[in-house]
């Protein structure tokens, strides 16, 4: 009987740790997307002479971009950022690739995060980057602690 309880406890620790690790991966992919998009938009801003542009002004009118975005709700005008006089075909593909980061993620939470973290070019501050990365290990620690508690309760 002891071994059965021990096995149940170990499986609880593994399960909780797995879900915590999955959450960390999602946060990391969001951070990478925000960082890549921010850097790209900075280059567009300097090339196009934009003073200010908001993510909420981006939309998808081109079918190629719709394919990358899937059902992700984006508003505004992407055509402003992909105007031929500003960007090459490679740069257009680059912004489409950046948007492809979000296709498999939860659209609602990422949409809210985009609106809150990137309201204009350079919108990701060092503090926000640090917060995203600081929270990451907490999920593993909490997940392991909860799993360990379940393990102790089972035994």
Please describe what each predicted stretch is:
Residues 76-108:
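Short, non-transmembrane cytosolic segments of multipass membrane proteins
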Residues 7-16, 129-155:
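Bilayer-spanning, highly hydrophobic alpha-helical transmembrane segments
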Residues 72-82, 130-135:
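Juxtamembrane/interface motifs at transmembrane-helix termini
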Residues 2-74:
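Juxtamembrane/interface alpha-helical elements of multi-pass membrane proteins
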Residues 101-145:
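Membrane-interface, cytosolic juxtamembrane amphipathic helix immediately N-terminal to a transmembrane helix
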Residues 37-40, 44, 91-98, 102, ...:
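Amphipathic alpha-helices that form helix-helix packing interfaces
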